[in-house]
């Protein structure tokens, strides 16, 4: 049983009219279904920021070679518009790299970014920045970030960026590419402009009770930095650990993660 002792306030938002939309923010609740949303809505006494969504749709999530998808194939479909095989990341069923929304944005002169609460070699962030036929090829996937070109990256997973078996220091390589590489929220908060690659934890970021509103802060920092481009930006934000606690059948942490994701929308 999960009980939210103090429900959080939710306001009704009115979409602006008469303005041309130039920024795109894609928010993904990893593994999140209608069940998660309704449970979180019930726990918060019938209110969610998600209720402000103007449209609702359903998608068939099967991948190219299986009925049951995974975050590799499913995330690739979201990132590129193409279905691929189970466990593949950012490539088509033949293993050829696909262009993601992040790289398409850069090509069109917009800035791009991702902000997640998981390790950066996890499938969803990798789907937008990397290319591999196997999502478990973690060291290879992480190395792809050096050349991905995305302007803002926030997440966990420092252990595969340094002290690697191949001897590469990916943080050093990223700095050589013009990135600033803060290793904590405090360091990130001080940055006022430029490209950022922030990895705060060895693997995933901490649980909500410990990290607080870190995802919301990291997302707002992305908007602040990417928004300096007058052409606009694309940003993908993921509530990454919802999926973990669904697998673990841990309703307490699952609801904490779902509410954290919902409050990030605010």
Residue ranges and their predicted role:
Residues 1-164, 168-188, 259:
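N-terminal catalytic scaffold of extracellular/periplasmic and nuclease hydrolases
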Residues 21-32, 105, 199, 232-240, ...:
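Beta-strand elements within well-structured catalytic alpha/beta cores of enzymes
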Residues 102, 142, 223-224, 266:
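Generic structural signal for well-ordered alpha-helical scaffold segments
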Residues 123-129, 202-205, 231-232, 236-264:
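Active-site His/acidic residue clusters
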Residues 159, 175, 193-195, 205:
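Conserved alpha-helical scaffold segments that buttress catalytic/binding sites
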Residues 184, 188-199, 218-240:
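Active-site regions of oxyanion-processing enzymes, predominantly non-cytosolic
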Residues 204-215:
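Binuclear metal-dependent hydrolase catalytic cores centered on His/Asp/Glu-rich metal-binding motifs
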Residues 219-222, 260-266:
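Short, well-ordered amphipathic alpha-helical segments that serve as non-catalytic structural scaffolds
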């Amino acid at each position: 049983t999960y009980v939210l002792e103090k429900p959080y306030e939710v306001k009704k938002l009115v979409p602006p009219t008469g303005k041309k939309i130039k920024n795109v923010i894609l928010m993904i609740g990893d593994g999140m279904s209608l069940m998660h949303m309704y449970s979180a809505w019930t726990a918060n006494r019938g209110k969610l920021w998600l209720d402000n969504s103007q449209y609702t749709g359903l998608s068939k999530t099967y991948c190219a070679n299986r009925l049951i998808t995974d975050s590799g194939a499913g995330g690739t479909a979201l990132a590129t518009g193409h279905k691929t095989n189970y466990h593949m990341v950012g490539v088509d069923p033949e293993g050829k790299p696909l262009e993601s929304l992040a790289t398409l944005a850069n090509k069109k002169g917009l800035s791009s970014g991702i902000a997640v609460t998981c390790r950066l070699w996890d499938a969803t962030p990798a789907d937008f920045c990397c290319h591999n036929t196997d999502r478990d090829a973690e060291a290879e996937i992480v190395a792809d970030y050096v050349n991905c070109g995305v302007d803002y990256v926030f997440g966990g997973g420092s252990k595969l960026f340094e002290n690697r078996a191949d001897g590469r220091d990916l943080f050093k390589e990223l700095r050589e590419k013009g990135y600033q590489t803060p290793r904590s929220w405090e360091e990130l908060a001080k940055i006022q402009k430029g490209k950022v690659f922030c990895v705060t934890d060895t693997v995933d970021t901490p649980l909500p009770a410990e990290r607080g509103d870190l995802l919301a802060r990291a997302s707002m920092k992305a908007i602040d930095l990417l928004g300096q481009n007058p052409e606009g930006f694309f940003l993908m934000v993921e509530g990454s650990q919802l999926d973990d606690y669904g697998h673990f059948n841990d309703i307490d942490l699952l609801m904490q993660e779902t509410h954290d994701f919902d409050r990030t929308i605010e």
